[in-house]
């Protein structure tokens, strides 16, 4: 399966039991910042934004004082899982980032999608990729 198919079929799909509700943007990005696949709506990000995200995975709490920036949008960092998941909030939406062995799985959402639904979609694919050694 292509990386684009993972984004299209597993991240940008309807959320179980909520037809028509889906993430607003998603991507799979290598630890080096190279985009493996992304939705058409995923923001253009700067290398320093990706560096900050990777630093937070290695040094949990790094982004808490400044916020998480992606594509020029600032998210307030909320409770995640140290070294595994970063979660951010902005207004009625937010972001979930799951780290796998080789990649970062991104999901961005707006209401009516809930933070929990975004977490479920992103983390389920991330856990699958980890099981596959990716």
From Swiss-Prot:
Question: Which Pfam family, just one, is annotated for this protein?
Answer: Profilin
Task: Tell me yes or no: is Acetylation among this UniProt entry's keywords.
Answer: no
Q: What SMART domains does its record include?
A: PROF
- InterPro entries under this entry? PFN, PFN_euk, PFN_sf, Profilin_CS
Where the record places motif Involved in PIP2 interaction is: 84-100
In terms of one coarse class, where is the protein primarily found?
Answer: cytoplasm
From the record, give the cysteines joined by S-S bonds.
13-118
Q: GO molecular function of the protein, one example? A: actin monomer binding
Q: Where in the cell is it found?
A: Cytoplasm, Cytoskeleton
| Entry keyword set | Actin-binding, Allergen, Cytoplasm, Cytoskeleton, Disulfide bond, Phosphoprotein
Modifications after synthesis and translation: Phosphorylated by MAP kinases.
Q: Tell me which CDD domains the record gives.
A: PROF
Task: State a GO cellular component annotated for this protein.
Answer: cell cortex
Task: Indicate where the modification Phosphothreonine is found in the sequence.
Answer: 114
Return the similarity comment.
Belongs to the profilin family.
Q: What does this protein do?
A: Binds to actin and affects the structure of the cytoskeleton. At high concentrations, profilin prevents the polymerization of actin, whereas it enhances it at low concentrations.
Subunit-level organization = Occurs in many kinds of cells as a complex with monomeric actin in a 1:1 ratio.
- Quote the record's miscellaneous comment: The variability of the residues taking part of IgE-binding epitopes might be responsible of the difference in cross-reactivity among olive pollen cultivars, and between distantly related pollen species, leading to a variable range of allergy reactions among atopic patients.
PANTHER family linked: PROFILIN, PROFILIN-5
Q: What is this protein called?
A: Profilin-2
